[in-house]
Design a protein with these regions (language model features):
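Electropositive phosphate-/nucleotide-binding environments in soluble metabolic enzymes
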Residues: 1, 34-41, 80, 107, ...
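A Rossmann-like FAD-binding core segment of flavoenzymes
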Residues: 47-72, 147-226
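Beta1-alpha1 glycine-rich phosphate/pyrophosphate-binding loop at the start
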Residues: 1-42, 46, 124-125, 130-171
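Short, ordered loop/turn segments at secondary-structure junctions
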Residues: 19-22, 32, 60, 91-92, ...
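Short, acidic Gly/Pro/Ser/Thr-rich loop/turn segments
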Residues: 94-95, 137-138, 196
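Short N-terminal signal/transit or membrane-insertion segments
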Residues: 16-29, 87, 193-196, 205-206
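FAD-binding core/adjacent interface of flavoenzyme oxidoreductases
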Residues: 40-127, 207-225
Length: 226
């Protein structure tokens, strides 16, 4: 959306192709119990102020047969589009590193858990362990807590020294500070990672390597992201 707003100043016709049913991607996704974030609302208002910006939702590019041509697929049809300038904003892809038991029902990506919750999956009172590395863990924990889930543990694989360096930079992103402070310190453990997800027909508990040794936590969901 930011790219479209900047490009609209040229006066040309701007078309935003989005594979999602609404704008905002994963970061600004709303849902039944999650209102549209303020940042997204601001972007929507800016776009509405430009009559030369249009949206096409549920659309994805499947081919570029010729220079300046795109083949676009939608749920019920397909079409060819011509363009002079193309800006690709494909976002990031969540990295999921496999471990024993990673295919058990109840094991998802950290971003995947966020998407499920925002789409309406009920997690109230479910016991959740979040593991991996990076700020997405805090965001996933925050989303789960707002949906009334029980966040039992956040296992951060990065070393304590790296986490401290990251924490010193959080002043640049106030929202991340709020997410970090909303999680009890004892639940966030650096130098920790998943050894195994355990269960018969679905996830029952997770085995973690921590600075204090191997521990096992009974849980309903495990969300991992790197």
């Amino acid at each position: 959306m930011s790219a479209a707003i900047a490009a609209a100043e040229s006066g040309g016709r701007i078309l935003i192709l989005d594979n999602n049913p609404q704008a905002g991607g994963q970061i600004l996704r709303a849902g039944p119990i999650f209102p549209v974030p303020e940042m997204a609302q601001q972007k929507y208002q800016q776009i509405k102020a430009h009559s030369n910006i249009e949206f096409m939702f549920g659309a994805k590019i499947v081919a570029a047969p010729f220079a300046g041509q795109l083949l676009v697929e939608r749920p019920h049809d397909s079409l060819n589009l011509s363009y002079r300038q193309l800006i690709l904003c494909t976002g990031a892809r969540e990295l999921f590193l496999p471990f024993p038991g990673w295919t058990l029902p109840g094991v998802t990506g950290a971003g995947g858990l966020q998407a499920l919750i925002k789409a309406g999956t009920p997690v109230k009172n479910e016991r959740i362990v979040i593991a991996g590395s990076g700020p997405l863990l805090l965001a996933s924990a925050d989303t789960a807590k707002k949906a009334e889930a029980q966040v039992l543990y956040v296992a951060e694989q990065a070393a304590s020294s790296s986490v401290r360096k990251f924490a010193l930079q959080l002043w640049r992103w106030p929202a991340k500070i709020i997410q970090a402070l909303s999680l009890p310190y004892r639940l966030y453990q650096p130098d920790s990672y998943v050894v195994e997800a355990i269960g018969q027909e679905r996830l029952e508990r997770v085995r973690l390597q921590t600075p204090k040794g191997i521990i096992e936590i009974e849980c309903d969901r495990l969300a991992c992201g790197f």
